[in-house]
Structures are given as C-alpha cells and as structure tokens.
Amino acid sequence: MNFILNHKWADGNTPIRQEDAEQLIPRISTMGELNEYEALNILQAREWAFSSRTMTSANPLEEFYVRTLHSRMFDQVWKWAGKYRTNELNIGCDPAEIVQHISQLLANAKYWLDHKTFPIDECMIRFHHQLVSKIHPFANGNGRHARMITDVIAVKHGQAEFSWGAGANLVTEGRARAAYLAALRALDANENDVKSLLEFARS
C-alpha cells in the first residue's frame, strides 16, 4: 500500500487516499503491477461494454450503467469500484451532490441527442467534459471511465469510437496527456470552447 501513498502522481491525476488504498484487492507491490492489473480489468470491461449483447440491451444514459461500467473496469483491483467517492476533491462536485449531477447530466445528454441540440460528436465532448471535470464521481479512474462511456454512447448513436489522441497513453505524463488536460481546462474556462477537446478526441 505504501507504494501507492508515496507515488508521485501525474498532473491531473487524483491521488489515492490511504482509506482508498486499503481497498486494494490483489497482492500488488508496485505501480507497474497495479497498472497491469487495471489494464487487464479495463480490457475485460471493454469486451463487455462493446459486446453486441450489452450494446443492444444496456442503456449507457442510465445512472445504473455509469456505476456498472466503473465496477466492470476496476472490480478485480479495487473494492470501491463502481461506488461514488465520499470525499471532497479539488476537482468535481461535492460528493453529496454526485447522484444529482449525474442524473442531470444524463438527462441533458439524452435531450441533446434526441433534439439534435449539437452535432453528435459535440454532444459527446460536452458529456465527457462534464463527467470527468465537473462531477468526477469516483475515487480514481475517472478519465478512463469517462472516455469509455463516451465511446459507448457514440457507438450507440452510429458514430465511431473516439481515438483520444491517436490512442496515446493518457494515464502517464506526456505530450498527449498534457494536450488532453489543456483541452479539458479550456472547457472549464469557457463552456463553449469545445474545439480543442473535439480535435484531440478525433485526432
């Protein structure tokens, strides 16, 4: 557990608290092992999310799906997978308001898509930004979760998955992550400044 608490987190990453680190499931002793376990877990979640059965039967614009997808992505690593955070962060909303904000975001996204308020890609970018930056519902894994659920919704509406910086690793420090964070922060500053994030997501 100490390797997690002592880890130097990349810019924009949510540091894992001791209470959350204690919820680690496997016997992992390095960040490298943790990343490998999470990557495998996420791959399995992806297979579930994009399977024809799930794409046909599940509705990603339901609050239950938001939690279920996060659980599927991290349930073999963290006991808090699929559970909303209970602590305040320097990003996202008050933890007591997460369910309310998630429900409102899902309703907004459904309205945007049904009424063609914006082009589908822009709907998805706005949804992604609100989920990861304005709500940030989970203790960790918010970016990876928000990107996958955004892809699922896009595919459900006839669009291709986003490339998110040509498939670059957005978890670790690097030019792609810096560009991704800069695009999110541009939207933080101006809710109509979607160009940078949209271009990054489709690059």
What spans do the regions from the language model cover?
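FIC/Doc superfamily catalytic core
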Residues: 1-203
